[in-house]
């Protein structure tokens, strides 16, 4: 995150106890330590880090991948099996939608040094369904699996609605899992949907999201247009 510092990545002097005496000794940070071992280092939410700090990995991304520690007069050569990965919701372009507040725009010179950039889309519906069922054991029945499959359908409709620009909030697999867990607690699928996802949506868009739910489950929610019209 944005609190990761250069010292965390590169290393710093620390007071250690050796032979009963306190001495100052340099301790490798995350990057030098991982670089020297057969480790896959993953920078999760890479675009949340401060750009000036993330420049530390610039040389590691070069073809040779050597890391120079000038203060220590060391040149660290990467282990043959060392690999560096990163995840970023904005692909380094910065937050233009407001959904990923707190992320940073990554320097394009650094982005250019990543050899492979790929997109990880949502899971296929059967896979997402099986994950939820595996996490919520009470749904591991024929009726439960059918219910979860329909929940995933609602989630997919929010994703398509987001792509089309109809709504500004989207259901992640994590939200579907939370919905299933809350449904187990409250014994009410519609109420669980409202507290798990619908209440997080923009008030002006809730009727659209409630319609997604109605299309799949055939049940009107209090936020539905039809219910509001009857009032």
Annotate the PLM regions.
Residues 124-231:
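Alpha-helical lid/collar subdomain of P-loop NTPases
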Residues 1-149, 153:
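AAA+ P-loop NTPase catalytic core and its hallmark functional loops
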């Amino acid at each position: 995150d944005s609190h990761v510092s250069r010292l965390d990545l590169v290393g710093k002097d620390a007071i250690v106890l050796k032979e009963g005496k306190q001495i100052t000794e340099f301790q490798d940070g995350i990057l030098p330590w991982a670089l020297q071992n057969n480790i896959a280092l993953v920078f999760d939410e890479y675009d949340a880090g401060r750009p000036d700090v993330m420049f530390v990995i610039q040389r590691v991304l070069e073809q040779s991948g050597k890391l120079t520690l000038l203060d220590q007069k060391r040149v660290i050569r990467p282990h043959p099996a060392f690999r560096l990965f990163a995840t970023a919701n904005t692909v380094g372009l910065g937050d233009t939608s407001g959904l990923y507040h707190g992320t940073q725009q990554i320097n394009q010179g650094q982005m250019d040094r990543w050899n492979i950039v790929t997109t990880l889309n949502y899971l296929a519906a059967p896979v997402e369904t099986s994950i939820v069922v595996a996490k919520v054991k009470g749904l591991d029945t024929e009726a439960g699996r059918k219910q979860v499959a329909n929940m995933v359908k609602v989630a997919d409709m929010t994703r398509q609605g987001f792509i089309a620009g109809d709504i500004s909030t989207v259901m992640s697999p994590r939200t579907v899992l939370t919905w299933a867990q809350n449904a187990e607690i409250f014994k009410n699928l519609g109420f669980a949907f409202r507290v798990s996802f619908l209440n997080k949506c923009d008030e002006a868009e809730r009727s659209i999201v409630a319609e997604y739910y109605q299309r799949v489950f055939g049940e009107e929610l209090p936020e539905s247009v039809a219910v509001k019209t009857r009032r």
